[in-house]
C-alpha cells in the first residue's frame, strides 16, 4: 500500500502552503519511507510543529479579560460594586434584585446581615423599589444575624418593640406571666386545696397509721388558715411488724370486728380505736380489690 505512494508529492503541498518554516521537512521521505517494510515509524522529533509559535489571530471571548478568578464566596456575600464589568448579565441581577425585594430582602440589608460590614460599599438600591434602612435594624442584626429580615418582627415582639434588649424587659405580658405563678387566682387555690384533700384522704385510706387526734389537729389549722398559706404534710406513722401480724390474724378470723374486740386490740397493740377501725376498713377494700383481680385473671374477661 505504501510502496505506491510518492512521499515527495505527499510532502510537497505542505511545504508550498506553509512556506519556509517547514523547509526542514525535506528529509521526511528518508525518515518515514522504508521500501522493504510495510509499516513505518514516524519520527516527530525532527518535524517542526504545525502551529506557529505566535497565534495568527486573537481568540475573542464573550467576556472581558479582567474577569476575576472564581471565588468560593457567593454572590449574596459580595458587594454589588465589584460586578460592574458584567453588563451582559445585568438583567439576571435585576431579576434577582426584584425577587429579593419581593421577599422583603433588600440586597444591602442582606449583605449587612451576612457580612456585618456597614461601610464596605455604597448604597445598592433597586431603581423601582428604593428602600431606607430602618432605625431599629442594626439592633435587630445583633438579635438575628442568620435569619432574614422578615423574621425580625418575632424578635421585636419578644423585646416589645425593638431596641436593645433591656436587663429587665418592661413588657406587661411578661410581668403578668411572672406574677401569675406568685399569686394564682382563688379558683386555682380552691382546686388545689380540693386535690390536696383528696390525696390526703387516699393517703389516709392506704396508710391509716396516723392517730385520729393528730389527723384532726392537722385538718383544723388547714381550714382556719389563709388560702395562700403553705400546707404542712402530716407525719407518716407506719405500723410495726408485730402490730400488722396481730391485725392480720384477727382479720383472718373476723372480717368485720365489733367494738369490744376493737378496744381490746387497741389496748394490746398500743393503738387508738380509730387506727384499728381504719386499718380494718382499708384491709377490707384491699381484699375486695384482690378478689376482683383474681376473678379477672381466672375468667379471662376484663369487663368483670
UniProtKB/Swiss-Prot annotation:
Record flagged with keyword Hydrolase: no
Cross-link (Glycyl lysine isopeptide (Lys-Gly) (interchain with G-Cter in SUMO2)): 82, 116, 178
Function: Sequence-specific transcription factor which is part of a developmental regulatory system that provides cells with specific positional identities on the anterior-posterior axis. Binds to a promoter element of the lactase-phlorizin hydrolase gene.
Annotated GO MF terms: DNA-binding transcription activator activity, RNA polymerase II-specific; DNA-binding transcription factor activity, RNA polymerase II-specific; RNA polymerase II cis-regulatory region sequence-specific DNA binding; sequence-specific double-stranded DNA binding
Protein name: Homeobox protein Hox-C11
GO cellular component, one term: nucleus
Residues within the DNA-binding region(s): 232-291
Gene Ontology biological process: anterior/posterior pattern specification; embryonic digit morphogenesis; embryonic skeletal joint morphogenesis; endoderm development; metanephros development; organ induction; positive regulation of transcription by RNA polymerase II; proximal/distal pattern formation
Domain of life (superkingdom): Eukaryota
Organism: Homo sapiens
The gene coding this protein: HOXC11
Family: Belongs to the Abd-B homeobox family.
Stored InterPro entries: DUF3528 (IPR021918), HD (IPR001356), HD_metazoa (IPR020479), Homeobox_CS (IPR017970), Homeodomain-like_sf (IPR009057)
Subcellular location: Nucleus
Record keywords, A-Z: Developmental protein, DNA-binding, Homeobox, Isopeptide bond, Nucleus, Transcription, Transcription regulation, Ubl conjugation
Membrane-spanning intervals of the chain: none
Pfam families to which the protein is assigned, alphabetical: DUF3528, Homeodomain
SUPFAM superfamilies registered for this protein in UniProt: Homeodomain-like (SSF46689)
Annotated stretches, region: Disordered: 166-237
Record bears the keyword Metal-binding: no
Amino acid at each position: 500500500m505504501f510502496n505506491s505512494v510518492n512521499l515527495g508529492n505527499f510532502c510537497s503541498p505542505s511545504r508550498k502552503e506553509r512556506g519556509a518554516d517547514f523547509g526542514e521537512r525535506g528529509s521526511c521521505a528518508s525518515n518515514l519511507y522504508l521500501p522493504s517494510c510495510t509499516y513505518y515509524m514516524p519520527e516527530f522529533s525532527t518535524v517542526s510543529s504545525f502551529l506557529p509559535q505566535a497565534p495568527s489571530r486573537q481568540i475573542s471571548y464573550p467576556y472581558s479579560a479582567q474577569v476575576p478568578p472564581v471565588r468560593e464566596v457567593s454572590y449574596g456575600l459580595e458587594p454589588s460594586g465589584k460586578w460592574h464589568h458584567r453588563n451582559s448579565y445585568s438583567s439576571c441581577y435585576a431579576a434577582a434584585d426584584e425577587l429579593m425585594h419581593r421577599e422583603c430582602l433588600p440586597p444591602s440589608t442582606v449583605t449587612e446581615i451576612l457580612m456585618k460590614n456597614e461601610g464596605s460599599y455604597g448604597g445598592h438600591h433597586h431603581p423601582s423599589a428604593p428602600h431606607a434602612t430602618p432605625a431599629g435594624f442594626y439592633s435587630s442584626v445583633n438579635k438575628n444575624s442568620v435569619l432574614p429580615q422578615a423574621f425580625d418582627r418575632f424578635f421585636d415582639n419578644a423585646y416589645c418593640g425593638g431596641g436593645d434588649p433591656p436587663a429587665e424587659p418592661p413588657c406587661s405580658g411578661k410581668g403578668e406571666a411572672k406574677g401569675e405563678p406568685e399569686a394564682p387566682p382563688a379558683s386555682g387555690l380552691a382546686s388545689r386545696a380540693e386535690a390536696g384533700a383528696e390525696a390526703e384522704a387516699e393517703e389516709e385510706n392506704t396508710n391509716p397509721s396516723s392517730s385520729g387526734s393528730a389527723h384532726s389537729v392537722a385538718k383544723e389549722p388547714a381550714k382556719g388558715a389563709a388560702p395562700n398559706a403553705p400546707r404542712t404534710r402530716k407525719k407518716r406513722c407506719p405500723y410495726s411488724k408485730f402490730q400488722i401480724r396481730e391485725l392480720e390474724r384477727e382479720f383472718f378470723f373476723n372480717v368485720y370486728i365489733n367494738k369490744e374486740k376493737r378496744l381490746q386490740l387497741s389496748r394490746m397493740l398500743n393503738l387508738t380505736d380509730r387506727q384499728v377501725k381504719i386499718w380494718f376498713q382499708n384491709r377490707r377494700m384491699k381484699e375486695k380489690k384482690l378478689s376482683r383481680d383474681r376473678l379477672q385473671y381466672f375468667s379471662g374477661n376484663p369487663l368483670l
